[in-house]
């Protein structure tokens, strides 16, 4: 029984060490989540203005807009930018988005541009054609780091290698709730709106509405991907925080059970020793 007590003590120490790690990971994930969400929220107003500008151009009475980005195409092949994580220990974060992506791509001719190591590994193993992979996008992602993504998808679209473009990412709602979002980016659908008369009189586009529009679209797409990456990163950290919190709680419960086992074993040892002493004393009488 002494050997058993030693084993239990070693297990308690091991679980305590693990609990310290999971607690630290939980705190780190909380901090990273908050920073990513704040950056995403601060960026949205600028890209909302870009979108509004594109809508104004598309709504103008001049009807001069003939951008390649808005012309409808007969769908042949769709490109999917799918944002996953680079690491594990995040509960069902990656599994959820991959399942939704496969549902959307089912029965279609597609190509995949995965963001994140986990996304690349999953869709490569599933046999999806990978056009280009994007990994190791840092937590402190900057807008310049999504330019490569935008340049790639625009080239594919202009060269008619894809006829539609989608982004699939996870929107952070709360640490307990993350929603998989699927957005169609190209061709752009801009809901026309009625412009005020003064808007027609004051807005002039040089050299042309289409040229200005075509220069805004890449910036707008950069904003979409930038916010999507940040939302996904916040969602990943939220899922990881919950997973680590659960692991910490489970470790605490395990330690309680092990301590109970240890105390029972210790009590049994004491009882056994007392019994042996009493038996020895009786034998001497």
Language-model features: where?
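C-terminal beta-strand-loop-alpha-helix "lid" module of Rossmann-like NAD(P)-dependent dehydrogenases
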Residues: 1-285
């Amino acid at each position: 029984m002494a050997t058993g007590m030693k084993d239990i003590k070693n297990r308690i120490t091991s679980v305590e060490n693990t609990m310290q790690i999971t607690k630290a990971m939980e705190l780190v994930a909380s901090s990273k989540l908050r920073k990513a969400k704040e950056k995403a929220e601060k960026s949205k107003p600028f890209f909302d203005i870009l979108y509004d500008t594109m809508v104004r151009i598309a709504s103008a009475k001049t009807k001069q807009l003939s951008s390649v980005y808005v012309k409808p195409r007969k769908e042949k092949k769709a490109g999917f930018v799918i944002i996953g994580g680079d690491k594990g220990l995040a509960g069902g974060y990656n599994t959820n988005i991959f399942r939704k992506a496969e549902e959307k791509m089912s029965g279609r001719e597609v190509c995949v541009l995965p963001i994140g190591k986990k996304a690349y590994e999953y869709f490569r193993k599933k046999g999806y054609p990978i056009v280009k992979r994007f990994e190791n996008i840092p937590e402190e992602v900057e807008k310049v780091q999504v330019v490569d993504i935008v340049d790639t998808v625009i080239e594919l679209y202009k060269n008619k290698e894809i006829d539609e473009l989608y982004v699939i990412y996870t929107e952070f709602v709360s640490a307990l709730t993350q929603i998989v979002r699927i957005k169609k980016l190209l061709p752009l659908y801009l809901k026309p709106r009625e412009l005020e008369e003064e808007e027609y009189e004051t807005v002039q586009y040089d050299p042309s509405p289409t040229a200005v529009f075509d220069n805004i679209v890449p910036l707008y797409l950069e904003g979409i991907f930038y916010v999507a990456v940040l939302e996904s990163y916040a969602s990943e950290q939220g899922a990881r925080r919950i997973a680590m919190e659960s692991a910490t709680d489970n470790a605490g419960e395990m330690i309680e059970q092990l301590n109970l086992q240890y105390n029972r074993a210790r009590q049994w040892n004491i009882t056994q020793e007392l019994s042996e002493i009493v038996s020895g004393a009786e034998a001497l009488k």
